[in-house]
């Protein structure tokens, strides 16, 4: 999180650049004593990780907000990582990219901490059992919460774009799709776990 970097706490991140020479030079120049950058020339996978982890963080927050437990969150994060890798590969990236800082690392951070705007919104949605529109309408009536209601939550916009990507690349992303259904009020939160758990059996991957 940016606040921790500003305070000099240790951190690491991926720097995506197709030009390896330029990427290595930029990583070396931009790294700080307490913050290390690792060059990654696989730009597609880094981009997919950066976008989709926000959607999975929303889902993780909803899971905890609704009281579904730590086991459910761990399963969701793990299967969410699989969806990230699946989409990256379909778009021409590499699955292994998502095992690094821009995938697993960023996902663990964003999907478990209340410093994350996406996770915080998920918690609120899970506790309220409402769609995004319903929660926003209720929140902005409280002047003390109006500022937080206007926060930019990247996962909301990303979730809305995923249906098109799934169709274009022929990829199934059941968790990400469920988040969009929840945000738009197409399905109640109480029904989502049952919907996901009753999907046709398949091998892990």
Provide a role label for each language-model segment.
Residues 1-3:
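Glycine-/Pro-rich loop/turn segments that contact NAD(P) or position catalytic residues
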Residues 10-58, 62-97:
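Internal alpha-helical scaffold of NAD(P)-dependent oxidoreductase catalytic cores
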Residues 53, 57-64, 68, 89-99, ...:
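NAD(P)-dependent Rossmann-like dehydrogenase/reductase catalytic/cofactor-binding core
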């Amino acid at each position: 999180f940016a606040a921790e970097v500003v305070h000099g706490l240790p951190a690491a991140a991926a720097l995506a650049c197709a030009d390896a020479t330029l990427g290595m030079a930029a990583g070396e120049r931009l790294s700080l004593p307490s913050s290390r950058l690792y060059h990654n020339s696989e730009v597609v996978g880094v981009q997919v990780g950066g976008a989709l982890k926000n959607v999975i963080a929303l889902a993780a927050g909803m899971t905890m907000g609704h009281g579904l437990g730590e086991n459910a969150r761990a399963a969701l994060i793990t299967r969410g990582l699989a969806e990230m890798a699946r989409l990256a590969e379909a778009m021409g990236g590499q699955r292994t990219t998502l095992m690094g800082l821009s995938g697993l690392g960023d996902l663990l951070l964003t999907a478990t901490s209340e410093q994350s705007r996406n996770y915080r919104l998920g918690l609120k949605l899970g506790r309220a059992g409402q769609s995004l529109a319903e929660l926003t309408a209720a929140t902005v009536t409280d002047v003390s919460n109006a500022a937080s209601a206007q926060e930019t939550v990247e996962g909301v916009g990303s979730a809305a774009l995923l249906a098109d990507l799934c169709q274009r690349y022929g990829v199934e992303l059941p968790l990400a799709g469920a988040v969009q259904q929840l945000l738009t009020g197409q399905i109640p939160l109480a029904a989502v776990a049952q919907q996901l758990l009753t999907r046709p059996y398949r091998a892990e991957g």
